[in-house]
């Protein structure tokens, strides 16, 4: 039989871009089909036509009877089965390699464009790092199947499953399950029914049952892979939105406690929210100067009424001053002010009644 290395190299590339179940299917294909078929089964069906004997000397009768008993050899039938079953995987492998290559080119173009934007002194990827840009693996080391790549993979599984079923049914209708030792031929040019004998029927039956069992196992693996991919997509479509909604409910807008702004002890004016969300001072400089002037005049009048003989206002810390009408208690002088013994006027060194010492 021919060399399987060419097909094996292609299937090794498919192994890199397959799911876990797909890798098991490829292992079964390599070991239990190609290896067994190329080593043991071929020796059992060596020169099958030469070992086929018939009880006749009629020219051409033996060839006609062999064609009736074996329309196609089991070995060649199984080779066709492996080729047709592997073809969808090869098509998927070609699409995967094309997709990865396009992704690599796109990332390289983005890297070159970013280098042009940054300038000539930027870092350039070496060849080894450029090859790593085509990595499509997830965190657990598996290939991320999504988009058109996932659709192609599912189609390849469906086609190979159909091929598998077709070849199993075809083998049953052509040969049945077991080979019989005696085959009765009634075809022309045989003058009468001729008895023909198959060589090594028991050994061939063992290989036939084994290959049918491997084909059934491959079919079950294909169905399991379809179920795995379908269940994964259904879980991603229905479970993840529910988890997202639950997270949104848990992390909803929290109602905070609005706390008022408390000014420092010597700070008599609080900032208020102005239009546009900005802070502004509700009192202008002119208003503050006018209020301070009014407070000073009021304190001067009170000092003259309490101590008519003195020209200074004495502020005692232990005594709480009365607040005149119309003056806000929040704008009175703080308790940190004290009397000053310095001269109050540059024009005269004598203290006058209108001088104010704070």
From Swiss-Prot:
Database matches in InterPro entries: Connexin, Connexin40, Connexin_C, Connexin_CCC, Connexin_CS, Connexin_N, Connexin_N_sf, Cx40_C
Stretches for region Disordered: 319-358
Membrane-crossing segments per the record: 20-40, 77-97, 165-185, 206-226
UniProt cross-references to SMART domains, sorted A to Z: CNX, Connexin_CCC
Modified residues (Phosphoserine): 353, 357
Coiled coil ranges: none
Signal peptide: none
Protein's job: One gap junction consists of a cluster of closely packed pairs of transmembrane channels, the connexons, through which materials of low MW diffuse from one cell to a neighboring cell.
Disease tied to this protein: Atrial standstill 1: A rare arrhythmia characterized by the absence of electrical and mechanical activity in the atria. Electrocardiographically, it is characterized by bradycardia, the absence of P waves, and a junctional narrow complex escape rhythm. Atrial fibrillation, familial, 11: A familial form of atrial fibrillation, a common sustained cardiac rhythm disturbance. Atrial fibrillation is characterized by disorganized atrial electrical activity and ineffective atrial contraction promoting blood stasis in the atria and reduces ventricular filling. It can result in palpitations, syncope, thromboembolic stroke, and congestive heart failure.
Protein name: Gap junction alpha-5 protein
Organism annotation: Homo sapiens
Gene designation per UniProt: GJA5
């Amino acid at each position: 039989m021919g060399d399987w290395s060419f097909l094996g190299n292609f299937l090794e590339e498919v192994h890199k871009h397959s799911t876990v179940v797909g890798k098991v299917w490829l292992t079964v294909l390599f070991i239990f089909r190609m290896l067994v078929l190329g080593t043991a089964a071929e020796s059992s069906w060596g020169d099958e036509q030469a070992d086929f004997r018939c009880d006749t000397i009629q020219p051409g009768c033996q060839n006609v009877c062999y064609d009736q008993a074996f329309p196609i050899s089991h070995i060649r039938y199984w080779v066709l089965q492996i080729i047709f079953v592997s073809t969808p995987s090869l098509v998927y492998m070609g699409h995967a390699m094309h997709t990865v290559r396009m992704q690599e080119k796109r990332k390289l173009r983005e890297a070159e464009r970013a280098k042009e934007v940054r300038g000539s002194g930027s870092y350039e990827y070496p060849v080894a790092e450029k090859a790593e840009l085509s990595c499509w693996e997830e965190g657990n080391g598996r290939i991320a199947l999504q988009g058109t790549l996932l659709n192609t993979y599912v189609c390849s599984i469906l086609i190979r499953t159909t091929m598998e079923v077709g070849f199993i049914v075809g083998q049953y209708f052509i040969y049945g399950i077991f080979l019989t030792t005696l085959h009765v031929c009634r075809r022309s040019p045989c003058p009468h029914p001729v008895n023909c004998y198959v060589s090594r029927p028991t050994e061939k039956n063992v290989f036939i049952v084994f290959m049918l069992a491997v084909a059934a196992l491959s079919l079950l693996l294909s169905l399991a892979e379809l179920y795995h991919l379908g269940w994964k997509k259904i879980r991603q479509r229905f479970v993840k939105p529910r988890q997202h909604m639950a997270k949104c409910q848990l992390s909803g807008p929290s109602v905070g406690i609005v706390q008022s702004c408390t000014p420092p002890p010597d700070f008599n004016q609080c900032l208020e929210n102005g239009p546009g969300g900005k802070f502004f001072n509700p009192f202008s400089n002119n208003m503050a100067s006018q209020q301070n002037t009014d407070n000073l005049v009021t304190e001067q009048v009170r000092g003259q009424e309490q101590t008519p003989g003195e020209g200074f206002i004495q502020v005692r810390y232990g005594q709480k001053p009365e607040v005149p009408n119309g003056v806000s208690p929040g704008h009175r002088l703080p308790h940190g002010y004290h009397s000053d013994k310095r001269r109050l006027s540059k024009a005269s060194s004598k203290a006058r009644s209108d001088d104010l010492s704070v």
